[in-house]
């Protein structure tokens, strides 16, 4: 590894496992949720038609929201839970970002205590009330 030139700023090394959860807004106002290590790169892929099929032909796309979540496993669990939420809940998340911390912590804690087979997973919406109570 090369040493930086004298007087040069050291280059920060990104964390080994730094994942983001993000939402992309389509031209018609739909919100798409995904995960990536680089949301801006992923947005460019979606815009070029090389990303998710769900976004192909949906007009101009904008990155509406992104949040660092750490490890890939946590990102996958949070993406799964966020995709289950209503559009109204997601819109509130965009305008009230403090809600994310309460919900993500609750969802990850629930995932740790409820280890169950994938086929047994049911749509879980009851955590929304807990998230709202924690934020209010």
UniProtKB/Swiss-Prot annotation:
SUPFAM superfamilies: GIY-YIG endonuclease
Signal peptide extent: none
Domain GIY-YIG per the UniProt entry, residue ranges: 17-92
One Pfam family from the record: GIY-YIG
Comp. bias regions, Basic and acidic residues: 124-136
PROSITE patterns noted in UniProt: GIY_YIG
InterPro entries per record: GIY-YIG_endonuc, GIY-YIG_endonuc_sf, UPF0213_domain, UPF0213_GIY-YIG_endonuc
UniProt-annotated stretches for the region Disordered: 114-136
Family: Belongs to the UPF0213 family.
Protein name (database record): UPF0213 protein AHA_3736
Organism name: Aeromonas hydrophila subsp. hydrophila (strain ATCC 7966 / DSM 30187 / BCRC 13018 / CCUG 14551 / JCM 1027 / KCTC 2358 / NCIMB 9240 / NCTC 8049)
